[in-house]
Amino acid sequence: MDYLQNRKENLRKQVEDIAELSALPATVVQVMDVINNPKSSAADLASVISADPALAAKILQVANSAFYGFPRKIATVSLAVVVLGFDALKDLVFSISLLQMFSGGRAEQQSLRKQFWQHSISCGASARFLAKKLGRRLPGESFVAGLLHDIGKLIMSQYWWEDFKRSLELAEREDITFREAEEMTFGANHAEVGGWFAESWNLPAQLAETIYYHHTPLMARTDAQLVSLVHMANILCHQMGFDANGRPRELVLEKKALEPFSLNGRRMSEDCLLGMQEQVHIQVQKATVFNHILNAG
């Protein structure tokens, strides 16, 4: 076994250990349990959320933002549950919790983490917009998938900062993709690391697959449409400058990933996708409420 293969296997074990230690807050687990119980009522869910005032406040903050665009104020958690519905609440609670995970480190780590989340929020908002535009059910799931797609970068920069920084420098110096630099440094890339983490967390298969294959969507099997949506959203965000590591031209659109989609009766094309940039930018701006939550800590 060569050095990089050995490093990859050791890295996977370490990521699995990190996932065990990075458990979601107890309230979030309770919320998920209530939502997944077919006997649960809206009152049951509202009761669990209301028991965590900080989470409840953030849910109301997002529910009353331009992100959802409801015409009247949602003043209570009970009303938020009724108006948003269980599926949207599940995605929202999970997203809010993710934004508050992983902290500390050096100033440059914190700066990079902020850029990471800004890119991820933008990608989530873009994926949600594309899901609505292209007729996919449950656009909130697309937002979560977009938010999570690069979580491998977050983990690598949090726990192996010097190696991660070395990968950034290597990509710049050798003019190679960041994934290539990661593989030379770690023996694995961020998509693999994120996928291992998602599997260890027992996330739904379609979310784990989206993380694994957001750069290689044709490899997806569980939910190829979701993976393709996030792939497209990621490309758009990089093209528009919503980029986590400042290398916007290194990503390549997998054109075959567009084939399952149509818009206004016509098959989706690269020109059509890139022509949505103005609309996508508006949706990204509406998602700034998540940046406020991130900055509030």
Listing of model-derived features with the role each one plays in the protein:
Residues 1-4, 269-297:
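Terminal targeting/low-complexity segments that flank the catalytic cores of oxidoreductases
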Residues 139, 205-207, 264-276:
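Short, surface-exposed acidic
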Residues 99, 262-265, 282:
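All-alpha prenyltransferase/terpene-synthase fold signal
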Residues 245, 255-266:
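A hydrophobic, small-residue-rich beta->alpha segment in the mid-to-C-terminal subdomain
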Residues 1-255, 294-297:
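Conserved alpha-helical "signature site"
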Residues 240, 257, 262, 277-280:
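Generic low-complexity, intrinsically disordered sequence content enriched
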